[in-house]
Regions:
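N-terminal auxiliary segments of SAM/dcSAM-dependent transferases
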Residues: 2-90
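SAM-dependent Rossmann-like transferase core, predominantly class I methyltransferases
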Residues: 59-61, 67, 71-148, 152-167
Length: 169
């Protein structure tokens, strides 16, 4: 347990602000923690949360991040190695080709759930559709956007989940 705390503290005290140094540092930490797609997650994080273009990430090796940006990056690394899902960190997941806001109030939509959309597309259209336990609202929203049902409702007993679903509408 102490080793983990020391490890986590050393992450927040990394001294370089150079983008390339930070990327290499993150990749090294992730590879040691068996995060298999760590390189891709780092790129996505830099694009989504620090608004860096892929060109900047791949070619501007001398770019210096501001201290605030560096701290965001290091916190991302810390959260990831502590097991927090990547989608919660960037507050985004893709479902059926559309980005949805997610946070710990909702489950991250599973790719397998997209099969429900495929089945409904073949069998529909329907007059009504009800998504019980709507969470992020992804299923109800995709059903509505694809005109699979004339009227779609999403229900959830969790008010925070309903806030997320409403935000995604």
């Amino acid at each position: 347990m102490k080793k983990t705390n020391i490890e986590l503290n050393s992450i927040t005290t990394f001294h370089s602000n150079k983008l390339l140094d930070l990327i290499k540092y993150g990749e090294k930490i992730f590879s040691g923690k068996s995060i298999s797609n760590g390189k891709q997650e780092i790129q996505w994080f830099l694009q989504k949360k620090l608004s860096l273009s892929l060109t900047t990430i791949q070619l501007n090796h001398k770019k210096e991040l501001k201290n605030r940006e560096k701290q965001k990056f290091l916190l991302f690394i810390k959260r990831r190695i502590c097991g927090e899902p990547f989608q919660y960190i960037i507050n985004t997941t893709t479902f059926y080709g559309k980005d949805f806001f997610v946070n710990p109030s909702v489950l991250i939509p599973r790719p397998e759930t997209e099969l429900i959309i495929a089945i409904a597309l073949k069998a529909g259209p329907y007059k009504r559709a009800l998504d019980i336990g709507t969470g992020a609202g992804n299923l109800a929203i995709i059903l509505a956007l694809n005109n699979i049902a004339q009227h779609v409702e999403g229900l959830d007993i969790c008010s925070k989940a309903l806030e997320v679903a409403k935000y995604n509408c």
